[in-house]
């Protein structure tokens, strides 16, 4: 049995890594159905999807976000955050 050489799949470009101080918003598709969404209000506020929030701390796969509103800071998974543009 002859093996055919398999060509490696083209690597998808990873989004730029978010760093402390970055302006972010929540990716609705990644957030809905997550553990974080289940532990929160069933109707998330629009401002988390509209942004911007400031990424205060990154620890492992989670980031702490501060919104420009009088609300508490929140911890969200980094894959649920995207750069605000």
From Swiss-Prot:
Q: Please verify whether the record's keywords include DNA damage.
A: no
Subcellular location field: Cellular thylakoid membrane
Primary location recorded for the protein, binned into one broad class: membrane
Annotated disulfide bonds: none
One GO location term (cellular component): plasma membrane-derived thylakoid membrane
Could you tell me what reaction this enzyme catalyses? a plastoquinone + NADH + (n+1) H(+)(in) = a plastoquinol + NAD(+) + n H(+)(out); a plastoquinone + NADPH + (n+1) H(+)(in) = a plastoquinol + NADP(+) + n H(+)(out)
Q: How does it assemble?
A: NDH-1 can be composed of about 15 different subunits; different subcomplexes with different compositions have been identified which probably have different functions.
Q: What is this protein called?
A: NAD(P)H-quinone oxidoreductase subunit O
Q: What is the lineage of its organism?
A: Bacteria, Bacillati, Cyanobacteriota, Cyanophyceae, Synechococcales
Q: Which gene encodes it?
A: ndhO
């Amino acid at each position: 049995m002859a093996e055919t050489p398999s060509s490696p799949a083209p690597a998808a470009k990873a989004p730029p890594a978010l760093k402390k101080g970055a302006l972010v918003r929540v990716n609705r598709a990644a957030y809905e159905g997550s553990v974080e969404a289940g532990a929160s209000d069933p109707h998330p506020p629009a401002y988390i999807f509209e942004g911007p929030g400031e990424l205060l701390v990154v620890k492992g796969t989670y980031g702490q976000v501060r919104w420009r509103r009088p609300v508490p800071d929140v911890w969200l998974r980094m894959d649920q955050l995207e750069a605000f543009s």
